[in-house]
Swiss-Prot record:
Pfam families: PA_decarbox. Keywords: Decarboxylase, Lyase. Belongs to the PadC family. It comes from the Bacteria. Catalyzes the decarboxylation of phenolic acids. This is Probable phenolic acid decarboxylase. Gene3D superfamilies: 2.40.128.20. GO terms for molecular function: carboxy-lyase activity. The lineage of its organism: Bacteria, Pseudomonadati, Pseudomonadota, Gammaproteobacteria, Vibrionales. It is an enzyme of class 4 (lyase).
Amino acid sequence: MRFERNDLSGFLGKSFIYNYDQGWRYELYVKNATTIDYRVHSGIVGGRWVKDQTVHISRVGAAIYRVSWAEPTGTSVALTLNLEDYVVHGAIYFPRWIVDEPEKIACYQNDHLPLMEAYRDAGPIYPTHVIDSFATLIYMRDCGLNNEQVINCPPSELAEDYPFCLADKNLLPA
């Protein structure tokens, strides 16, 4: 094996912005070994942002990481980030109620957890809608661990040229 499976040091504290093939833009901050923050800039749930989501992180290659989680909404997500080829693969399992009314979760989830759970419990859950898609990394930066400033507002409050207006260096090649 060319890598140490338990060494997440090249991944923790990183922030990623990526565009799915459908044109949706997502942002992921790996806050620590068990927690992420994320923001959905565009797509069917554009406007959604979440802090302190508990996740499972695995290193599956020298520069390949898997992040998996289940949300209070009933959504399950599995992301594979390939930091050598600058590719993300996402598998998102949306319960039917989100597909039918995605605007219900286009908010700051942390302020609405009981409501998200009530929506989930009311359903319908099935048939689940699976989105299995590739994305291209467009921005990567090192923000350090547990930085509450990385994702601290909805996407609607970001500058028009975000993320390219950031003072942080983009770690992806030009």
